[in-house]
């Protein structure tokens, strides 16, 4: 479906839960979030019906997110059913990787073709600090389980934070030489009030490229990421800059929260409820959300301070 500004909307990000087994500082409060009543969340059948309605409007790609989607007990069933919806060509999933030793192969068999894994640091102590409770050893176990499951593509996402991991740009990028993965550096966005990070946390991508003098532009399309390549590497380096160089003009996505709200923009207060609707009702709301998609996200700091809604774990990134 084409939105008001001529963009083809083909990508739906689906948050299946707000809950997580980690507490990453830029994503959610230290105490987590209050678990909502089961009746307030989309059921599996409602979620699949929403995917069917989205596919009827031209959505072809799904990304399953959270929270942490792998804490959802029926995550494999959700992925299997979503991958079989007519019109859906690709089902991807974003995870912290901790539960992949048990779930990587079942997810691949259920139709998930691509994985994004969160990895902000290679230092075990810093990993425990940023996640508030995670173990880097557990991450690597999940990562290798994903490699063994032979997904079509694996990407590692690192949120750049000044004074925390800006000294690890090269070591993180070097993972593309060791493994057949992409490493993507993501600008810090003003989302979570409890993060404790100030303006100094923002890292311009000129500093990333300065830390990677060997990197050359890669010709391959990276979607929202600007791609670079290290000589001899097995994967690419991506730079995602929603703050300094927003990609609103090419944005092709909408988001569905775990409690059944469609968000036309990550940084907008606008939400279109789907919970309790039949197929036609969901389709109408999805169409309204697409037509209500703003031309650009505006000033992110202003949007954040005005309460653009939710912490990142409640939206799905």
Q: What do these predicted regions represent?
A:
Residues 41-64, 71-186:
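Radical SAM/AdoMet-radical enzyme domain recognition
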Residues 28, 104, 131, 266, ...:
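Short, flexible helix/strand-to-coil boundary loops that buttress conserved ligand/catalytic motifs
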Residues 8, 13, 26, 50, ...:
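Residue-level recognition of specific faces of alpha-helices
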């Amino acid at each position: 479906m084409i939105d008001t500004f001529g963009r083809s909307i083909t990508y739906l990000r689906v948050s299946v839960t707000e809950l997580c087994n980690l507490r990453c500082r830029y994503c959610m409060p230290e105490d987590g979030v209050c678990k909502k009543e089961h009746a307030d969340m989309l059921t599996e059948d409602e979620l699949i019906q929403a995917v069917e309605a989205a596919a009827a409007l031209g959505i072809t790609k799904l990304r399953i997110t959270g929270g942490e989607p792998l804490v959802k007990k029926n995550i494999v069933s959700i992925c299997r059913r979503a991958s079989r919806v007519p019109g859906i060509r690709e089902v991807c999933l974003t995870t912290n990787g901790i539960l992949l030793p048990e779930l990587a192969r079942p997810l691949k068999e259920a139709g998930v073709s691509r994985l994004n894994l969160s990895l902000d640091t290679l230092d075990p102590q810093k990993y425990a600090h940023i996640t508030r409770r995670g173990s880097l050893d557990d991450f690597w176990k999940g990562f290798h389980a994903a490699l063994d499951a032979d997904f079509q593509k694996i990407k590692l996402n690192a949120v750049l934070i000044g004074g925390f991991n800006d000294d690890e740009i090269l070591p993180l990028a070097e993972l593309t030489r060791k493994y057949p993965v992409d490493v993507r550096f993501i600008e810090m966005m003003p989302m979570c009030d409890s993060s404790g990070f100030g303006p100094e946390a923002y890292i311009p991508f000129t500093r990333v490229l300065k830390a990677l003098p060997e990197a050359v532009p890669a010709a391959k399309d990276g979607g929202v990421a600007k791609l670079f390549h290290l000589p001899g590497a097995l994967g690419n380096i991506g730079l995602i800059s929603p703050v300094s160089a927003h990609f609103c003009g090419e944005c092709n996505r909408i988001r569905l929260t775990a409690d059944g709200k469609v968000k036309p923009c990550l940084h907008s207060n606008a939400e279109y409820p789907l919970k309790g609707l039949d197929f036609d009702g969901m389709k109408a709301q999805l169409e309204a959300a697409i037509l209500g998609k703003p031309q650009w996200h505006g000033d992110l700091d202003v949007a954040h301070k005005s309460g653009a809604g939710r912490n990142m774990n409640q939206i799905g990134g």
